[in-house]
Amino acid sequence: MKPRVLGMILAGGQGSRLAPLTQKRSKPAVPFGSKYRIIDFAINNFINSGMFSVYVLTQYKAQSLTEHIQRGWRFGTFLSDYFITLVPAQMYRFEELGDAWYRGTADAVYQNMHLIDNFEADYVAIFSGDHIYKMNVEHMLEKHIETRADVTIAAYPMPQSQAHQFGVMQVDERWRVTEFHEKVPDPPTIPGQADLSLTSMGNYIFSRRALEELLEASISGQETGYDFGHNVIPRALSDGYHVQAYDFHKNPIPGQERPNTYWRDVGTLDAYFEANMDLVSVNPEFDIYNPEWPLRTSSEFSPPAKFVHESEGRKGQAFNSIMAGGAIISGGTVRDSVLGRNVRTHSYSLVESCVLFDDVQVGRHSHLRRVIVDKDVVIPPGTTIGLNREHDEQRGFTVTEHGVVVVPKGYVF
């Protein structure tokens, strides 16, 4: 008999390091890759893995995310086990916990244990909703069952110099976790590989009994400590549970020949920008064109993109770029850029290495370089952005450490 697996996506992230993109939306709702939202990649991982029972746990500035999922992720009403359902923070355990919203990743699941009980899940796959990657969750589940683990953690080898931002684990020869350290300044390295650490991707599969016991022991009656990385996983190890690591690099993706090595935490503006730029290379490591692993999202029924004008010096053209429906390149040039729906670049404009969200207009003779422009911004004719840091900062734009300029949503020049 096929096991009952419930997916839970943690989508309550505030994403403060992505401000101003998260000024009016949560991190999982931030647009990415021309037509997607960050949350779409986690949902697609479940759907493409044949797992159709998914709760999305939301909290911070969730309206944009709510509308996106309600528009784009509906199965209908005929199959009760096929659902993508939003679960906002609602103080469900008020009598026990008092006046408390979700206080951490583990607490978000703890406050919704009734959903797991009602579903009668055998296994619960708890995944982060704010990373860019492809993952065959079914394969991870198979390894979880095969090793008879109580908890399985998706693991990603990373340079030790970067690993302090993540949970880091040590494993034995069978990849059973022996130690776990959450965001420590000097992370331990992989034995024999002094420059690499084995980091947690924030994706877990729990056997239901172990999840119930660990959440009850870790959270019930506590006043601090409500996270999987800080509290639940260390508790599982100290209490003798079988915690297994799963090697993400061995995760098979149908239709993909190269190893599955692409995983990006787009938690900073620079990381977010570079992940978008990854998509426009000739042969990107993260391939969004694999028909055997389709990437679905909300349909906006936009018209096709269009390129107009071809006179000398006034040609509508784009190079090494991707753009969504409704975009019009009207006598301007776009290079190495990612354009959202209904973007319009006017004559003699030049857009280089930019990420333009939906409904952005770039005026005539404007020049943009390494700029993220949020939705509904009209850039006047003759405007330059990204060419003079001091000028950009004087206009109130965020300029990152690596020189990426961010124009906030609805900015008026």
Curated annotation (Swiss-Prot):
GO terms for biological process: glycogen biosynthetic process. PROSITE patterns: ADP_GLC_PYROPHOSPH_1 (PS00808), ADP_GLC_PYROPHOSPH_2 (PS00809). Signal peptide: none annotated. It is an enzyme of class 2 (transferase). GO terms for molecular function: ATP binding; glucose-1-phosphate adenylyltransferase activity. It catalyses: alpha-D-glucose 1-phosphate + ATP + H(+) = ADP-alpha-D-glucose + diphosphate. InterPro entries: ADP-Glc_PPase, ADP_Glu_pyroP_CS, GlgC_bac, GlmU/GlgC-like_hexapep, NTP_transferase_dom, Nucleotide-diphossugar_trans, Trimer_LpxA-like_sf. Pathway: Glycan biosynthesis; glycogen biosynthesis. Alpha-D-glucose 1-phosphate binds at residues 102, 167, 182-183, 200. Keywords: ATP-binding, Carbohydrate metabolism, Glycogen biosynthesis, Glycogen metabolism, Nucleotide-binding, Nucleotidyltransferase, Transferase. The keyword Nucleotide-binding applies. It comes from the Bacteria. CDD domains: ADP_Glucose_PP, LbH_G1P_AT_C. Its EC number is 2.7.7.27. NCBIfam families: glgC, PRK00725.1, PRK00844.1. Homotetramer. Involved in the biosynthesis of ADP-glucose, a building block required for the elongation reactions to produce glycogen. Catalyzes the reaction between ATP and alpha-D-glucose 1-phosphate (G1P) to produce pyrophosphate and ADP-Glc. Belongs to the bacterial/plant glucose-1-phosphate adenylyltransferase family. This is Glucose-1-phosphate adenylyltransferase.
